[in-house]
C-alpha cells in the first residue's frame, strides 16, 4: 500500500512559512496542520502570529488554539494529536518553526514514561541548584527546563533520562515526508521580524497580554517571546519602546537559533530562500 505523502514546511519565525503553506494548500487541495509550540494555545493569537479565520482563506487548519492557557502542552501530546489528524487528511501540509515537533513527527520519540502530577509539582517548586544537586545519575542538561525534566524522570522511575532516550524510538505515523525549510537571507528575515512586531503593536498586542495577565494564566503560553517584556511594560517597569526593543532582540536571537537547528537537524530538507510554491510542488 502506498504511503501517505506529507509536506513539511519549516523555517524560522517570520520567514513566510504560513503564506507558503496556504499557497500550497490552495494548489493541491491540501489542509494545514500546525507545528508551532505556542500557536497551540488559545491565548495570544496576535503575539504568536496564529492565523485568523480571515487569513485561513477557507482552507482547513488543524491543531491551532486547542490548548488552554493553563495547560503545559509538550511534544508528546502534540505528536499524538498530529498522528490522529494527519491520516484523515488527503493532502496534509505540516507547518511550523518548532523543530523538535517536526523531528519527532518524522523520526519518532523515545519512550519516556509519564510523570505523576505530584512529582512534577515537587520538581517545579525546587530551586535550580537543588535540581542539579539531585541529578546524581547521568549527565546534567544545560538549561533548567531540561534539568527539571531529567529529574522528574529520575524520581519517577529510578532511571536517568538517557536510559529511555537510548531505547528504540516510537514512530507515530507511517508516511513519506517531503520537508522544505525556508531560510531567507538574514537581513530580509530581520526586516520581516521588525515589520511583524510593528504590526502586532498596532493590533493591540499589549491589550492581549494584559488580558492573559488578568486571567492568571500559568501554562506554556506564558513562555512565548514578548510576554515577559510586555508584562514589564504593563507593570511600569519599562516604557513601551524598551519592551519592543527587547522583543525584537529576543526574536532575532530565536530566529538565529532556529536557522542553525534546521540546517543541522534536517539535512534532507530542500532549502528555499524565497517561498515559491512551485519549488514545493515539484518535490
Feature map (PLM): residue ranges:
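Phosphate/pyrophosphate-binding catalytic cores of soluble transferases and nucleic-acid-acting enzymes
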Residues: 1-283
Amino acid at each position: 500500500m502506498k504511503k501517505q505523502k506529507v509536506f513539511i514546511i519549516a523555517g524560522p519565525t517570520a520567514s513566510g512559512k504560513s503564506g507558503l503553506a496556504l499557497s500550497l494548500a490552495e494548489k493541491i487541495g491540501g489542509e494545514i496542520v500546525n507545528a508551532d509550540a505556542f500557536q497551540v494555545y488559545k491565548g495570544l493569537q496576535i503575539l504568536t502570529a496564529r492565523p485568523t479565520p480571515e487569513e485561513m482563506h477557507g482552507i482547513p487548519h488543524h491543531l491551532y488554539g486547542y490548548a488552554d492557557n493553563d495547560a503545559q502542552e509538550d511534544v508528546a501530546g502534540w505528536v499524538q494529536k498530529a498522528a490522529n489528524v494527519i491520516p484523515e487528511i488527503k493532502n496534509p501540509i505540516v507547518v511550523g518553526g518548532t523543530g523538535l515537533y517536526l523531528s519527532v513527527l518524522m523520526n519518532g520519540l523515545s519512550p519516556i514514561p509519564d510523570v505523576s502530577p505530584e512529582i512534577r509539582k515537587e520538581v517545579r517548586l525546587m530551586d535550580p541548584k537543588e535540581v542539579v544537586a539531585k541529578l546524581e545519575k547521568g549527565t546534567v542538561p544545560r538549561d533548567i527546563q531540561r534539568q527539571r525534566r531529567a529529574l522528574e524522570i529520575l524520581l519517577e522511575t529510578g532511571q536517568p533520562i538517557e536510559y529511555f532516550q537510548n531505547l528504540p524510538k516510537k514512530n507515530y505515523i507511517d508516511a513519506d515526508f517531503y520537508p522544505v525549510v525556508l531560510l531567507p537571507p538574514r537581513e530580509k528575515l530581520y526586516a520581516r521580524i521588525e515589520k511583524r512586531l510593528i504590526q502586532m503593536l498596532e493590533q493591540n498586542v499589549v491589550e492581549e497580554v494584559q488580558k492573559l495577565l488578568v486571567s492568571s494564566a500559568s501554562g506554556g503560553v506564558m513562555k512565548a517571546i514578548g510576554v515577559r517584556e510586555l508584562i514589564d511594560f504593563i507593570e511600569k517597569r519599562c516604557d513601551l519602546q524598551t519592551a519592543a526593543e527587547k522583543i525584537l532582540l529576543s526574536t532575532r536571537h530565536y530566529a538565529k537559533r532556529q536557522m542553525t537547528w534546521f540546517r543541522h537537524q534536517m539535512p534532507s530538507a530542500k532549502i528555499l530562500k524565497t517561498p515559491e510554491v512551485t519549488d514545493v510542488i515539484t518535490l
